[in-house]
């Protein structure tokens, strides 16, 4: 973003022109809560930038990093109590759910979008409510199936299966060799829902019709998807995945316990950065045996993907909303955002399209290139309807994830679907 835009947005043109920091009240502070990143160096970079931002803004900048599964409880508690962090990281379309507690940040968001090639469509669905930006789009977490090249070669495969049926057959052979697929299907923010929703869509299933007002989950495609996953789970998967969160599959892959898993780029990146300690069964660096396939293998209705849009929202209860917006503007300046972006190596990609052309993409390893345009391909929670607060509520209650989890634990496919349909009707039609 141009410096002039930054000055205009923060309303401190005269002060910065005089080479002084903005004159916020003495002791002013902006507190940002984000997840603990799966790329540790990304958090290190933000911590490094905090003093620079503090100097630029003339106020203290504090980053706090917490487990991603604790973000929603903290956001809810802050809104209910009227106190807490000034800025929260938002995932998916959470701004829809918390709209009444968020500041309009359209001035910041629109300036970033104009300067950086426009935001991806997913962010309009995620962070715009009633035509207003209630969070500033920050990045997208893509996902892909990380898979062991050598293990798949043992069963005659040189590329990853293209269809769910082919993946089930490959997984069956690998599980028989003690090398199962590993899939998180517990209550966790990322891997379970990004798998479950994409899987549902690949069979033609959806929560609602395009209006978002009528539940249409009970369909032939959904029933088939539940039945297939039940068989896939038994034939191909590590069945302990029912209790996994977003960290378990990373650890299992690095430990050589699973052959493939849907994940972001972190399994590869961390394995390479810790090549001296993360090794395969032959004692060689594990990263050399990792490939990525994206999106998930196709179901009867084709391929589908759910990636994770990230945004930052300023809370209405904040005593320093102008300062908070100033920080978001500063964070999105090209030189500041670019340093954070490069550290990620494709794990988190830009929210704006200009970052697809960043020189980093010419330098990073081929398995990471699959994430370059990930944000163009994602659907949003609520598909095939709009990404409303009701869609976020459904996600937050893990209804689609639990439909599959109940089935793989022994509930009849039709009964698991009926349960999920009933829960969705309480939200969408109640």
Q: Language-model segments: which ranges?
A:
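N-terminal secretory signal peptides and thylakoid transit peptides that target proteins
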Residues: 1-13
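Short, well-ordered beta-strand elements
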Residues: 27-38, 60-64, 86-87
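Conserved C-terminal helix/tail region of periplasmic/extracytoplasmic solute-binding proteins
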Residues: 29, 60-61, 100, 153, ...
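Short, polar/charged alpha-helical segment
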Residues: 39-60, 400
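Hinge/lid segment of periplasmic solute-binding proteins
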Residues: 91-144, 195, 285-295, 363
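C-terminal lobe and pocket-closing loops
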Residues: 93, 266-287, 299-399, 429
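Extracytoplasmic/periplasmic solute-binding protein
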Residues: 130-138, 143, 168-215, 221, ...
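Glycine-centered hinge/linker elements that transmit conformational signals in sensory
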Residues: 171-173, 211-243, 296
């Amino acid at each position: 973003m141009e410096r002039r835009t930054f000055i205009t947005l923060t309303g401190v043109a005269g002060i910065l022109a005089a080479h002084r920091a903005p004159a916020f009240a003495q002791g002013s502070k902006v507190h940002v809560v984000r997840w603990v990143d799966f790329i540790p160096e990304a958090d290190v970079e933000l911590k490094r930038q905090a003093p620079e931002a503090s100097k630029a803004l003339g106020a203290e900048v504090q980053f706090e990093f917490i487990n991603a599964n604790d973000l929603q409880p903290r956001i809810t508690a802050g809104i209910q109590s009227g106190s807490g962090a000034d800025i929260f990281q938002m995932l998916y379309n959470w701004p829809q759910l918390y709209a009444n507690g968020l500041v309009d940040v359209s001035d910041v968001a629109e300036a970033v979008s104009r300067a950086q090639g426009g935001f991806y469509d997913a962010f309009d669905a995620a962070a715009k409510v009633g035509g207003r930006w209630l969070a500033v789009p920050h990045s997208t977490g893509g996902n892909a199936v990380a898979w062991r090249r050598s293990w798949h070669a043992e069963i005659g495969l040189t590329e990853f299966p293209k269809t769910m049926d082919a993946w089930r057959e490959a997984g069956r052979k690998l599980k028989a060799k003690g090398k199962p697929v590993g899939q998180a299907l517990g209550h966790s923010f990322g891997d379970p829902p990004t798998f479950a929703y994409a899987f549902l869509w690949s069979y033609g299933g959806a929560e609602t019709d395009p209006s978002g007002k009528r539940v249409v989950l009970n369909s032939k495609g959904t029933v088939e998807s539940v039945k297939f996953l039940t068989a896939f789970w038994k034939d191909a998967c590590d069945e302990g995945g029912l209790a996994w969160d977003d960290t378990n599959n990373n650890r299992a892959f690095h430990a050589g316990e699973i052959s493939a898993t849907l994940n972001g780029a972190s399994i590869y990146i961390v394995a390479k950065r810790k090549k001296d300690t993360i090794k395969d069964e032959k004692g060689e660096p594990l990263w050399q045996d990792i490939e990525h396939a994206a999106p998930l293998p196709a179901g009867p209705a084709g391929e589908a993907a759910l990636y994770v849009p990230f945004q930052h929202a300023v809370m209405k209860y904040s005593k320093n909303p102008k300062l908070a917006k100033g920080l978001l503007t500063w964070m999105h300046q090209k030189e500041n955002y670019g340093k954070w972006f490069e550290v990620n190596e494709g794990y988190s990609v830009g929210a704006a399209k200009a970052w697809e052309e960043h020189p980093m993409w010419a330098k990073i390893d081929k398995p990471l290139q699959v994430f370059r345009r990930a944000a163009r391909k994602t659907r949003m929670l609520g598909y095939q309807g709009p990404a409303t607060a009701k869609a976020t509520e459904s996600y937050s209650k893990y209804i689609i994830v639990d439909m599959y989890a109940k089935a793989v634990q022994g509930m009849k496919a039709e009964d698991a679907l009926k349960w999920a349909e009933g829960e969705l009707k309480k939200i969408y039609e109640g």
